[in-house]
UniProtKB/Swiss-Prot annotation:
This is Uncharacterized 32.2 kDa protein in hmfB 3'region. Coiled coil: none annotated. Keywords: Hydrolase, Manganese, Metal-binding. PROSITE patterns: ARGINASE_1, ARGINASE_2. Gene3D superfamilies: Ureohydrolase domain. Its cofactor is Mn(2+). The keyword Hydrolase applies. One of its GO terms (biological process) is putrescine biosynthetic process from arginine, via agmatine. Belongs to the arginase family. It comes from Methanothermus fervidus.
């Protein structure tokens, strides 16, 4: 395979890690439903590249990286074919789960999250959705499966709860839908203006959690290289504080999506890698 995530272990080491929480990392270089800025197919590579910019020690947590992560490479995608790409995603995630690993998936556009979460029994799972957009359209550009419809399709899988964090863009129909279905959301202004209140509300939630992070949840000043940049976003500090709370609880999977750049050093890729490291440092093993 090509470039691996920094500090990741060889797959052959899995047999020696049976007593530890192990993360299996997969890339999904798919962006065929992108509608504004394509390029998230380069996201897995750019996040891996950015991972080498960080130390394996956290000054904040006063600890070395002690959670094993095994980079399993990229899933085969068929550009222009969501259905078969989604099938490939689900099959690979099932393999990761059968090996007792927790999946971390790097996109790619946000539609790929559907292929990941449909492998789980979601009846007791809370989906934590960090995003600038609600992604609750029933159809978008004539398609039922799209980066703009992904959370609507996930809602139809009947998770215990969906909580949307950092949203600031939607259609009238999407807003009416989340209100009618009692889907909880916190806007970016809620977070900026009432951060401690929102943080406490998130801390009260029960896991297990599946966490999906569209990097455009960050303000474009921190993450310009995304598929749909939207001003008045949250900051990396807000993300770090959310992760501190979330990582104390049971997490069944994580994805980070919509890094849309092919430029080494792009802040979107750097922040995506930092978010992943924050989870790995904060999670208890």
């Amino acid at each position: 395979m090509g470039l691996k995530f920094a500090y990741s272990k060889d797959p052959s080491s899995l047999k020696y890690l049976s007593n530890k929480k192990v993360f299996g990392l997969l890339g999904v270089p798919f962006d065929s439903t992108s509608t504004y800025k394509p390029g998230s197919r380069f996201g897995p590579l750019m996040i891996r590249q950015a991972s080498y910019n960080f130390e394996n020690y956290s000054l904040h947590y006063r600890k070395k990286l002690d959670v094993p992560i095994i980079d399993l490479g990229d899933i085969e995608v068929i550009l222009g074919d969501f259905k078969n790409t989604c099938r490939n995603i689900s099959e690979k995630v099932q393999e990761v789960l059968k090996k007792g690993m927790i999946p971390i998936v790097l996109g790619g556009e946000h539609s790929i999250t559907y292929g990941v979460v449909k492998t789980f029994d979601l009846s007791d799972v809370t989906i934590l959705h960090f995003d600038a957009h609600m992604d609750m359209a029933n159809t978008y550009a004539g398609k039922k499966f799209s980066h703009a419809t992904v959370m609507r399709r996930i809602y139809e899988l009947h998770p215990k709860k969906i909580v949307q964090i950092g949203v600031r863009s939607c259609t009238k129909e999407e807003h009416e839908f989340v209100l009618n279905e009692n889907i909880k959301y916190y806007t970016s202004r809620d977070i900026i203006e009432k951060f401690n209140m929102v943080l406490n509300e998130i801390n009260k939630l029960d896991g297990p959690f599946y966490v999906t992070v569209d990097i455009d949840v960050l303000d474009p000043g921190y993450a310009p290289g995304v598929g749909n940049p939207t001003p008045v976003g949250i900051t990396p500090y807000h993300m770090e504080k959310f992760i501190e709370k979330i990582a104390r609880k049971k997490i069944i999977g994580i994805d980070i999506v919509e890094v849309a750049t092919d430029r080494i050093g792009d802040p979107a890729a750097m922040n995506a890698a930092k978010i992943l490291y924050d989870f790995l440092f904060a999670i208890k093993i």
